[in-house]
Amino acid sequence: MKTVIRNFSHTFRRFFTASILNILGLSIAFASFFVIMTQVDYDYNFNKGYKDYEKIFRIEINPNPDSGWQLWTPRPLCEQLQSASPYIKSISQVESYQPEDEYEVNGNLFKATTCTGFGNFLETFQPEMINGSADALNQPKTVLLSESTAKKFFGTTDVIGQTIFRGKQADNNAWTIGGVYKDYPENSQIRNWVMMPKEADTDKGNWKNWNYICYMRLESPSAAPEIEKLILQIFVKNFPEL
């Protein structure tokens, strides 16, 4: 071992510049490999943080060749689809835009991203609940917080029944916390947001407002081709001009 070290030291002193360049080259190679593999892991595991993720699908529509594929859908499309097939275990509709809102909690102001949808729109993703129940979203003026958001607002996850205000308290827009769910991985479409239900009648029967993203959980991934046909049938029936 001493001989190896002595030879290395001798070579390093004799070929100083070349040795430095070799070390720098190896360092850059290892750093590049680490960065690339980190990105590969991020992409490979994208959206795999959900329970039985392979059963979850997002609806995308291509109305005509000129418009291309899009993920925005009207509310009635998803509701008709849910009742059209026994292979669909649940459907979740969320607003296509998640704003960063200000929240007042015990006199302190925080910023957090808000996701709104209809009913228990987390049912499709089956979050691991730390406290409370995801079904709390079926109650008006009741929200779910992620684990990290609960700790940010209150310093703890034991927050069931606590009140937060969307905006400032003076705005009188109070919401009760009905549950805390475990954080999703960063490489997920549904993130660690304040989950908030919309009013039940919003856009009900309205085919003109394409403002929602629709996710569904199937009994089996093999049912996807049949569901695609159902989507097309419902779409053609309600938009024969396209």
Predicted regions: what they are:
Residues 11-44, 54:
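Short, strongly hydrophobic transmembrane alpha-helices
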Residues 8, 27, 39, 77, ...:
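Structural preference for long, well-ordered alpha-helical segments in enzyme cores
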Residues 3-7, 52-54, 116-120, 124:
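Generic alpha-helical secondary structure signal
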Residues 12, 22, 40-43, 59, ...:
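Generic structural signal for small/hydrophobic residues in well-ordered secondary structure
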Residues 61-70, 79, 92-120, 126, ...:
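Short acidic/polar micro-motifs at solvent-exposed secondary-structure junctions
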Residues 36-101, 202-203, 209-217, 228-229:
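Membrane-proximal extracellular/periplasmic loop immediately following the first transmembrane helix
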Residues 1-17, 49-51, 230-242:
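Membrane-helix entry/capping segments
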Residues 115-131, 143-242:
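Mid-to-C-terminal secondary-structure elements
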